[in-house]
Structure formats: structure tokens, C-alpha cells
Curated annotation (Swiss-Prot):
InterPro entries: SPRR2. The lineage of its organism: Eukaryota, Metazoa, Chordata, Craniata, Vertebrata. Gut bactericidal protein that selectively kills Gram-positive bacteria by binding to negatively charged lipids on bacterial membranes, leading to bacterial membrane permeabilization and disruption. Specifically binds lipids bearing negatively charged headgroups, such as phosphatidic acid, phosphatidylserine (PS), cardiolipin (CL), and phosphatidylinositol phosphates, but not to zwitterionic or neutral lipids. Induced by type-2 cytokines in response to helminth infection and is required to protect against helminth-induced bacterial invasion of intestinal tissue. This is Small proline-rich protein 2A1. It is found in: Secreted; Secreted, Extracellular space; Cytoplasmic vesicle, Secretory vesicle.
């Protein structure tokens, strides 16, 4: 099972071609104040040391559209590994 299938439990989607900008909202390095809420980051924020049950991992297709997505050329990615 690929990383994206395992994390999202959805059909695989290719990652963004261009380097994504900073997170739409700041990603706390260690402490996430208040109740758990999704972090709309294209890369998870320190999932291995994330405190508590919060899971900031978000599928790429669930992230809000970014301006660079319309200008980046598409790139072919290998098909997802099925197990």
C-alpha cells in the first residue's frame, strides 16, 4: 500500500509538482492549542512527535487550491503500488 493510500485511504493522487508554499496557517512545532483541528498543510507537521491524538495528515486533494497549482506543469508519476 502506498503512502498516500495508507494515509488517506483514498485513490492515489500525484503530489504537487512545484514546491508548495508555507502552510496556509502556521503549523505549531510541538504544542497544538485548543481542540484537535485539521492542519491544511501539504506535508504533515512532525507526525512522529505530534502530541495527543491529533492527526494533521491531510490528503493532497483535500487541501485548499493554491495559485501555483494552475501554473505548474504536470509530471508523470509511477502508478500506485497495490498490495
Amino acid at each position: 500500500m502506498s503512502y498516500y493510500q495508507q494515509q488517506c485511504n483514498q485513490p492515489c493522487r500525484p503530489p504537487p509538482v512545484c514546491p508548495p508554499p508555507k502552510c496556509p496557517e502556521p503549523c505549531p512545532p510541538q504544542v497544538w492549542p485548543g481542540p484537535c483541528r485539521p492542519v491544511m498543510c501539504f506535508e504533515p507537521c512532525l507526525p512522529s512527535v505530534w502530541p495527543g491524538p491529533c492527526r494533521p495528515v491531510v490528503c493532497y486533494e483535500q487541501c485548499p487550491p493554491q495559485p501555483w497549482q494552475s501554473t505548474c506543469p504536470p509530471v508523470q508519476f509511477p502508478p500506485c503500488q497495490q498490495k
